[in-house]
Structure formats: C-alpha cells, structure tokens
Amino acid sequence: MLTDIRLLSHQLAKPRFRSPKELVAWMGAVQAQEYTMAKWAVGTRLKSSSLRVVDDALAKGEILRTHILRPTWHFIVAEDIRWMLQLSGGRIRTAFDSYARSRKMEITESFYTKGCRLLEQLLGGNKSLTKQELMDGFGRAGIETDNHLIHYFLVRAETDGLVCSGVDKNKKPTYALLEERVPPMKELSREEALARLATLYFQSHTPATLSDFVWWSGLAATEARHAVALIETDLLTEKFDSETFYLHVTCDLKACCRKVLHLLPSYDEYLISYKDRTTVMLHEHHHKAFNTFGIFYPVILYEGRIVGNWKKDSKKKALTVETSLFDESLDLPEDLLKKAVDYYCSFHAQKSGFHT
C-alpha cells in the first residue's frame, strides 16, 4: 500500500537512524522556515532523540539551514550545500528579485557588493551573528536597512554561497560565512547533481510522481524529467489510483505499517513535499491542514493518513497537547496518542501532561 511504503521511506515507521545528520542526509532536505518545528521534524523521525541533540548537530555545522531548492529555508547536511546551491540558487534569486521589485525594494549591484564586503568583515573569524546584529553592524557602517531589506539581502547572499546558518544565540538562528563553516567538498557536474537530487528524493519520499518531484525540487519539468531518466535503473513504476508513481528500488514493496501515530510539525515533509496530497488525506480536509496562502499547520498522522490537528499548551506546569480530529467519529488509540505526546514532551525536555 502506498502509505505503508511512504511511512517507511520517511522514517516515520521502523526508523533506521539515530543521528540528525544521518536523517537529514537521507531526506535530502527538510523544510525549515518554522525553526523549532523543523527540529521536531528531524527528531520525530529518529529512533530516539532530543532537542539538545538536534541543536548540537546544528551548532557543529553537521546540519545547515539555508534557502535552497525552493524560495524557503531547508535543513540540509553540509556536504550537500554547494551542489544544491548550484542547482537551485539562480531560481531562488529570480523569485526573490521579482518579489522585491513588487515591493519596490530592489538592491543595486553597488549596494550588494558593498554589503557583501561588510558581511565578510562582520562574520570573518568564524563569527555567528543574528539578523538583528547584522542590521546593527550595517547601521554602524552607515548602511541603512530595515527588516525586509536585510532579509532580502541575506537570502541573496545565501543563494550566492556567501553565508549559511551559524551557531544559535539565545535560541535565535544566526548567519556565518559558508567558506569558514563548510570545508571544501568535491564538486559535482550538473548531471551528477541532478542524479543525486533525484536519488535523495525518491529514496526518502517514495512512492512519488514526477509532478511531486518537480514541486519539491523546484526544477523545471524538463530538467526534473531528465534527472529521473538519469536514475531510471534505480526506479520502479506502479499505478496507484490510475496514476503512475516512481518507487526507489530500495523500498519495501511489501511494507505493512500498523499502530503508527505521530504529531507531525507544521510544514512536515510527509505532506508538503508532494504536489498531490489527496493520497494521504481527503480533499475536503485540506483547508484544515494548510490554507490558500501556503501556511501549513501541525497535523496528526495515523496509519499513513492525516487525520487531525494538534497544538501545544505550555501555560501549565506540564506541557499538554490539544488535539482535534477531522472526523470526530474516528477513535484514535489512546495508548498510541499518549506515546506520541510523551515523546514530544521528552524531546523538548518537558514534563508531559498528556492531552486534552
């Protein structure tokens, strides 16, 4: 069954990995604009983990957070950042340039060149600075910016391979120089990079369609089709509901996953990395999982299907989780729900108050 195979490939059933780096390397990229939620997306896919372990991997630079593949943040492993930027950096710049023009906040080449030199001065020597600290540094140098302009500037610096994520400060993300943060790696040709990206996606998101891969990768359809062709010997095809899906040869075609329940974070790969989400939830429930503006909510995953929403309530001494089901007649096993809530609380080193 499609969802059984997908649960295994996403490491949401019978997880194989213990370290955040192993997990992110397997997934290829994990969407991460909601920073805290993205850390949970990693943790919930590991055999056992904690927020501290994920934070340590980020601090060491084993995992990086940057704008890559599509115009949003993702977690990737350090070894993949340069070739992924080679594939996607130009497209992301184009998207942000278009957005900036619509907001009348274009950056001149003179401003960008001067700003990049200042970035190198501010961050040189393996420093990590928050966005606010960089804004303050620009101000001291006589370069006035605001929150929107500095964000646009930093995205461009990310996609040009000048900066990436640094070491968190007071739980806030920072920026660091990529050349100081990531040692030189073997370069990949564009063909090698395309094949590598397709392999990463289909091994960790299988079964998936070509349209799903186009959406996730940000590639043009022609180039995505070529990437799939480059690894065709590693892919099988199957029909699900009359649509052709690709399955990586390493997947378990006889997968049978029962008693699987997760509290998935907002923007989780299980939902957001596919163009067609009706394979895991009814269309009439889509608006409860994500809205027309592209905002995705925390959802409950039960036996391969998205069945409800959840939210935390940390006002009390113990962290509690409130749940609401799309279909109120569905009876979730209380032991599985308690186990999921307890792990979420344990991951965040907080006492569990179970759920209401």
Each language-model region and where it sits:
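Phosphate-backbone binding and catalysis cores of DNA-processing enzymes
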Residues: M1-L129, D136-D146, T320
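A short acidic, leucine-rich amphipathic alpha-helix
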Residues: A57, T130-G139, A157, L210-V214, ...
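A short, conserved structural fragment
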Residues: A59-I68, T72-W73, E158-D168, E232-F240, ...
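Short, amphipathic alpha-helical interaction segments positioned at domain boundaries
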Residues: M84-A100, E179-L200, S204, V260-S266, ...
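Positively charged, polyanion-binding regions of nucleic-acid-associated proteins
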Residues: S110-K127, R190-P207, V228
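Loop-centered beta-sheet repeat module
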Residues: N147-R225
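Non-catalytic regulatory appendages
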Residues: L230, D234-H285
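Glycine-rich, small/acidic residue-mixed loop/short-helix segments
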Residues: H283, F290-F296, I300-T356
